[in-house]
């Protein structure tokens, strides 16, 4: 007999381990039980915040060796990463839809979410990889799911869930879910609500959370442009800065992580030593040289700034989808009710993974569309 929806939900939700029980998420610890170093196909994940002087983020302790901040990747590992990186990218048309303002993907929603992620990343001194992962999860989710208009709490809840998952993937010490909601947020979500949203994100992304990012390659490409030697710390800092600035904008969403990393490495090395096109063509064997040069030109032309995340203004009320006068008789009264209102449906497949049920054909629309929330009371975090 097939398991019930509620029992599947309980089983899947039990995997969402937050700091409250001091466990790792998704059983990613190695055979010795160490959580700090995770491996995927023999390739080491990046840990450490360069801008903080190599700290492990969030009280994780300093990482003294540059080798630990940007582990050296082998040729075989890089080739493996390139093969699977596309599975960790948003839909191919996502960037165009964002910039086109067609309405199905709201650029304002993304900007607000990234702005909040950046605030918490800075407050807790998280690693740069954590911040990038949170944005990666956000973009992949938004490229497939359409959040309803006028549900500001949904944007904030999605931001909290994405950053919470990213912190569990990369940080050695993870703040409790309530503590992630710093300052005076408009809405304060309970742990159970955050876990439910985490589950929605996880299932929608097919549980592919150890994403390939530009940080996975940056040491490799910097070494290539530095005669095989470890890159100076200044190069690493500058690379980290550029990668995060690129993540905040929308002009690079179509580029693969390897292409972004190669372009950033070429830009940083060029600023320091005057690397030219011939050096790039000779050094980079795993990426399309034309795409790398195109990405590098975009970096140099646009001079991306962190300010880009705050430049989008809300749409006029007349352009918003739907109506605010939804029937109150069928309106869930809380985020938990909305998340429970037909959103999560699980089924067994060949991979035994929990998946979100498709709502109609073609692109999946958010099941929240049929569950408007009328009460958006301002709640403050009291400490």
Swiss-Prot record:
Residue spans of biased composition, Gly residues class: 51-62
CDD domains registered for this protein in UniProt: CYCLIN_AtCycD-like_rpt1, CYCLIN_AtCycD-like_rpt2
Domain of life: Eukaryota
Gene Ontology terms: cellular component: cyclin-dependent protein kinase holoenzyme complex; cytoplasm; nucleus
Pfam family name, one: Cyclin_N
Entry keywords, A to Z: Cell cycle, Cell division, Cyclin
Biological process, per Gene Ontology: cell division; G1/S transition of mitotic cell cycle
SMART domains, sorted: CYCLIN, Cyclin_C
Ranges where the record places region Disordered: 51-70, 313-335, 354-383
Keyword Metal-binding listed: no
Disulfide bonds: none
Residue ranges with Low complexity bias: 323-335
GO molecular function: cyclin-dependent protein serine/threonine kinase regulator activity
Family assignment from sequence similarity: Belongs to the cyclin family. Cyclin D subfamily.
Protein name: Cyclin-D4-2
